[in-house]
Swiss-Prot record:
EC number(s) given by UniProt: 3.5.4.-
Keyword Zinc appears in the UniProt entry: yes
Alphabetized PANTHER family for the sequence: ADENOSINE DEAMINASE, ADENOSINE DEAMINASE-LIKE PROTEIN
Record keyword Metal-binding present: yes
Lineage: Eukaryota, Metazoa, Ecdysozoa, Arthropoda, Hexapoda
Its job: Catalyzes the hydrolysis of the free cytosolic methylated adenosine nucleotide N(6)-methyl-AMP (N6-mAMP) to produce inositol monophosphate (IMP) and methylamine. Is required for the catabolism of cytosolic N6-mAMP, which is derived from the degradation of mRNA containing N6-methylated adenine (m6A).
Protein name from the UniProt record: Adenosine deaminase-like protein
Cofactor(s) this protein requires: Zn(2+)
Organism superkingdom: Eukaryota
Organism: Drosophila pseudoobscura pseudoobscura
List of residues binding N(6)-methyl-AMP: 16, 18, 68, 100-103, 173, 203, 278-279
UniProt-annotated binding residues for Zn(2+): 14, 16, 200, 278
SUPFAM superfamilies xref list: Metallo-dependent hydrolases
Protein family membership: Belongs to the metallo-dependent hydrolases superfamily. Adenosine and AMP deaminases family.
Annotated positions for site Important for catalytic activity: 223
Length: 340
């Protein structure tokens, strides 16, 4: 089954740039850009993917400071982006929607940050021709609304110059920070101007905010861990898929066991859902591994894995032609198995 899943042309719809660098890539990045190959750095990398039993969302977010330091220069950000694309390509991901929060520091402005990432995506096409990469700039709800408005303005600016690359906006960050309603103006502008919306919703048990988010609407829901049965029904009626990230939810402490993960209820009710990694580096996983967990936990068949992949194709922000090409790749893969 692992070989089948590994070779399957998969679709990744929920991947954060800075969280998707695995330990090998972190060491490659440190060595190439910063010349750091010390034993101390190796220990830092090991600690980066190590989770205690009492881990929670706050402890997970603390880990990102380590990677943000490595991507705080133009060269670091550029190489990190290339490494993430490389790692997903090596896992036979045929389509990747990468999300990242534009950052500003002494080395670059937020516009520069997005330009570096976009330019790297373009350059990577020749090196990794079998993976199609799109970008979703992220609003960090921990930051001021003015920063969110700048992020949306930049996303719209680059969506005009690179419409095949910038396809949506993500709202993420520490879920206990900021008020969702404060960001609705910026999100609504993005939606009115044609960008798709992905909202990290119900990561924590906050019923009033969950209701606000569902009322506001979204193209896809990130996590949905604390959605009620009524919320699930509302999502299904609106055909809003929930991005299920099993390892992430377990290691962050938001779900107590794989068996209790809400993906089970979504599959039983045939509600829209997609399997994703979230932060494959931080959580030391891959999309192949996530599918294997789904297979082993819920007794999912090969055909169901194919169906889950085709569902991800359907809910991607790719163009209609790109979705057809992705579905064709999956079909060719299935046909190749039948002729073996």
């Amino acid at each position: 089954m692992w070989k089948f899943l590994k070779e399957m042309p998969k679709v990744e719809l929920h991947a954060h740039l800075n969280g998707s660098l695995n330990t090998n890539s972190l060491q490659d990045l440190a060595e190439k850009v910063y010349g750091n190959t010390s034993e101390e750095f190796s220990h830092l990398c090991a600690r980066f993917v190590n989770f205690e039993k009492d881990s929670n969302l706050d402890k997970c977010f603390e880990k990102f400071a380590f990677v943000h330091e490595l991507t705080s220069t133009a060269a670091g950000l550029q190489y990190a982006t290339e490494l993430v694309i490389r790692d997903f390509a090596n896992d036979n991901i045929q389509y990747l929607e990468l999300r990242t929060t534009p950052k500003a520091n002494k080395n670059y402005l937020r516009r520069d940050y997005l330009r570096i990432v976009l330019d790297t995506i373009k350059r990577s096409r020749k090196k990794y021709p079998n993976i199609l990469v799109k970008l979703l700039p992220s609003i960090n709800r921990s930051e001021p609304v003015a920063v969110a408005e700048e992020t949306v303005a930049l996303a719209l600016e680059f969506a005009k110059t690179d419409p095949d690359l910038v396809v949506g906006i993500d709202l993420s960050g520490i879920p206990t920070k900021g008020k969702f309603t404060d960001f609705c103006g910026a999100l609504d502008l993005a939606r009115r101007e044609g960008l798709k919306l992905v909202i990290h919703c119900a990561e924590i048990d906050n019923p009033p905010e969950i209701k606000e988010m569902l009322s506001f609407g979204m193209s896809r829901c990130g996590h949905g861990t604390y959605l009620t049965e009524e919320d699930f029904a509302q999502m299904k009626a609106a055909n809003i898929p929930i991005e299920c990230c099993l390892t992430s939810n377990i290691k962050s402490g938001s779900v107590s066991s794989f068996e209790e993960h809400h993906l089970k209820r979504l599959m039983e009710s045939d509600a829209p859902r997609v399997v994703c990694t979230d932060d494959s580096g931080v959580f030391d996983t891959s999309l192949t591994n996530e599918f294997l967990l789904v297979v082993e936990t819920f007794n999912v068949t090969r055909d169901q894995c194919i169906d889950l992949t085709l569902e991800a194709v359907k809910h991607s922000f790719a163009s209609e032609q790109e979705r057809q090409q992705m579905a064709l790749k999956v079909e060719h893969y299935v046909n190749s198995l039948q002729t073996d």
